Amino acid sequence: MSRVAKAPVAIPAGVEVTLNEQTITVKGTKGSLTRVINSDVSVVVEDNEIKCSPVESAKTAAQAGTARALINNMVVGVTEGFVKKLTLVGVGYRAKLAGKDIDLTLGFSHPLVHKLPDGVTAECPSQTEIVLSGTDKQLIGQVAAEIRGYRPPEPYKGKGVRYADEQVRRKEAKKK
């Protein structure tokens, strides 16, 4: 069995977990999340713990570990939430909020407008910082990757949109 799946997920106080066949719903102070679990995994809720185990063979053990990690992310999301920080590096690179949109000026001839999906909130503490937050870890990461994808950091000058904790490997320019 997967080492990850062996550890049960603890349900903190104030979190309600409902299991309906292969659909699990987690409700907490920050909202609720629903996910369909793979049919190769059996999920049991008992004694303020969620336990995942593979249904058949060793081939499905990886699915049990994945399901356990996804459920843990749901529990953490509805209690604490997730935050992803982006930094804009470059002359004239700016970000500002306009309702549910982020207006990005990234050196193109036109400004880019990125629409935020439901469940993701954004803040701009400064013109060169974007802070994304929400309950769904996958959705936060997806939105952050889309914004970074507009202008990924380039290795020569380091300009572009990067994650706050990202280290960009720099290259030396060609010499004559």
UniProtKB/Swiss-Prot annotation:
Cellular component terms (Gene Ontology): cytosolic large ribosomal subunit
InterPro entries: Ribosomal_uL6-like, Ribosomal_uL6-like_a/b-dom_sf, Ribosomal_uL6_a/b-dom, Ribosomal_uL6_bac-type, Ribosomal_uL6_CS
Domain of life of the native organism: Bacteria
Keywords: Ribonucleoprotein, Ribosomal protein, RNA-binding, rRNA-binding
Region of interest: Disordered: 151-176
Family membership noted in the UniProt record: Belongs to the universal ribosomal protein uL6 family.
Described function: This protein binds to the 23S rRNA, and is important in its secondary structure. It is located near the subunit interface in the base of the L7/L12 stalk, and near the tRNA binding site of the peptidyltransferase center.
Record-given protein name: Large ribosomal subunit protein uL6
Taxonomic source organism: Shewanella halifaxensis (strain HAW-EB4)
